[in-house]
Amino acid sequence: MSKKVLVTGADGFIGSHLVEHLLEKGYNVKAFIYYNSFNSYGWLDTLPKGKQDQIEIFSGDIRDTNGVREAMQGIDMVFHLAALIAIPFSYHSPDSYVDTNIKGTLNILQAAKQLGTERVLVTSTSEVYGTAQYVPIDEKHPLQGQSPYSATKIGADRLAESFYKSFNLPVTIVRPFNTYGPRQSARAVIPTIISQLLSGMEEIKLGDLRPTRDLLFVEDTVRGFERISCFSETIGEEINIATQSEISIGDLANKMIELTNPKAKIIVDEQRIRPSKSEVFRLFGSNEKIKSLTDWETQFDLSAGIQTTIDWFSDNENIKGYKHEIYNV
């Protein structure tokens, strides 16, 4: 009998891809989506009807203790991805990040403890490391709260750790580096660049071009989640999902310009630059741990992942909801 799994944040970018991947692997999937009066299931609405019919939808709010407990009834394993993630928005609305990212994670952990859930995977972020003090960044690297967003994710990670150590809850903290691919929000750098280029703009507005990122294609990310969940050795661990490589934002932008509109040039837009102490200047992750504990390997190099992403955005049906002319926060 297949395991019944809950994916929180299933209506979002990574969550919707994870739902698809788990369905392909034969799991019985329940999707926790954010309640809204439009009955929108987010990116799940774009899946083929055959896939949609296989998904059990639960509309709720991760901040609501009772709703979370109800959603987790009868669940063998939970992949907790629901979170607020936009860094600029966290500067002026930090309360909402505490409520969603910390309290939401606590709700998942409490329900799992009470219900005896077999496995809990809590999603972290490479942002918790802050600017690299050494590379490649392994799981022992110090954590630095360089934004309200990353501070709340550090808090959520430590709560997850505490439930493992205090109550022996079978928790794993999964820490993907910068994931990109089809369906990603325009607040992220790759969709920002692509949507401007495909609109015909010849002046591409970006922030600081110097920071480097370890860019992970979404299919590698979700496969990492699934493989981590399959090995008991990962319980109680914090595990990076990374390519163990890096590229600067400037070089990344130039790569996409070459592929789509060679006449375009980059313009630095001051409003897109983070406060100097908040900017994470280098992220370059180690993937030694995930490789030692599981059978995961990257399958997409950057060129293949970027081309797949550009191809998806090139479909008018996909790009029509993106507002390339504004700064998406």
Regions found by a protein language model. Give the residues of each.
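N-terminal Rossmann-like NAD(P)+-binding domain of SDR-like oxidoreductases, especially those catalyzing
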Residues: M1-T179, I249, T308, W312-F313, ...
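Hydrophobic "lid"/C-terminal helical patch
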Residues: L18, I193, F225-S229, A253-M256, ...
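A short C-terminal helix-loop "cap" of Rossmann-like NAD(P)-dependent dehydrogenase/epimerase domains
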Residues: K49-I55, F167-P170, I194-K205, F231, ...
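Residue-level signal for the nucleotide or nucleotide-sugar donor/cofactor binding architecture
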Residues: R63, H92, T100-K103, S147, ...
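CheY-like receiver
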Residues: E70-A71, A111, Q196, G224, ...
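Glycine/proline-rich active-site loop of Rossmann-fold NAD(P)-dependent oxidoreductases
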Residues: I154, T179-T192, S199-E202, V218-E219, ...
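Substrate-binding strand-loop-helix patch
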Residues: P182-R187, R210-V222, E238-E258, R274, ...
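C-terminal "lid/loop" region of Rossmann-like NAD(P)-dependent oxidoreductases
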Residues: D208, G236-I239, G250-A253, N261-R282, ...
